[in-house]
UniProtKB/Swiss-Prot annotation:
Gene responsible for this protein: Clic2
GO cellular component terms given for this protein: chloride channel complex; cytoplasm; membrane
Pfam assignment, any one: CLIC-like_N
Protein name: Chloride intracellular channel protein 2
Family: Belongs to the chloride channel CLIC family.
Length: 245
């Protein structure tokens, strides 16, 4: 196991367990692990991160969380294992005024990218080369939907008293200029798609999707995302056996 601590102030005792990389120490490829990692970082709470080598589960893990794979969390000595419930718990418990709310204001911010990863998975696992174009088209349709949403101004961006009509959004992220739970869910998956689809399908997100690229550029500039991403090789290794070229 490898541990690192992120210190800010006196807080609850929190330890997040995430999947380790191929070296057994670094951060591994697990979008759900990264999702919780980002949430805790954005909350501004003090917490420890421990990487778990799932290939060689340490003895202490068998006692701590038998039959459980990362991510899981210990909050004030209480084990929590369902990542969706963990997310809900953290949003409810680490709340204002001390900690920021991360829930998005607009429901579509959560919904808009919900099919992207499934389309990518079908594309990367396809074994019939002649069908690749159809799978790619399905993936591109989902990227177009995301791009349209990111380029369409939210209600918060529209000034009813202005004589200028804003036709193109300038916001940084899905729900505005702050990262939210919606970004914590989508961004780890987008990073996987960008890396694995390029490696095994020579697929690049088209430059014409300016909203998607603006979003990714802004996201990689934030340490809460960039510093929780696995190395590209970890993503490539994950898909090496399933990507039928």
């Amino acid at each position: 196991m490898a541990s690192l601590a992120l210190n800010t102030q006196a807080d609850p005792e929190i330890e997040l367990f995430v999947k380790a990389g191929s070296d057994g120490e670094s951060i591994g490829n697990c979008p759900f692990c990264q999702r919780l990692f980002m949430i805790l970082w954005l909350k501004g709470v003090k917490f420890n991160v421990t990487t778990i080598d799932t290939a060689r589960k340490p003895e202490e893990l068998k006692d701590l969380a038998p039959g459980t794979n990362p991510p899981f969390l210990i909050y004030n000595k209480e084990l929590k294992t369902d990542f969706i419930k963990i997310e809900e718990f953290l949003e409810k418990t680490l709340a204002p005024p001390r900690y920021p709310h991360l829930s998005p204001k607009y429901k579509e911010s959560f919904d808009v990218g919900c099919n992207l990863f499934a389309k990518f998975s079908a594309y990367i696992k396809n074994t019939q080369k002649e069908a690749n174009k159809n799978f790619e088209k399905s993936l591109l349709r989902e990227f177009k939907r995301l791009d349209d949403y990111l380029n369409t101004p939210l209600l918060d961006e529209i000034d009813p008293d202005s004589t200028e009509e804003r036709t193109l959004s300038r916001r940084l992220f899905l729900d505005g200029d702050q990262l939210t739970l919606a970004d914590c869910s989508l961004l780890p998956k987008l990073n996987i798609i960008k890396v694995a689809a390029k490696k095994y399908r020579d697929f690049d997100i088209p430059a014409e999707f300016s909203g998607v690229w603006r979003y990714l550029h802004n996201a990689y500039a934030r340490e809460e995302f960039a510093h929780t991403c696995p190395e590209d090789k970890e993503i490539e290794n994950t898909y090496a056996s399933v990507a039928k070229q």
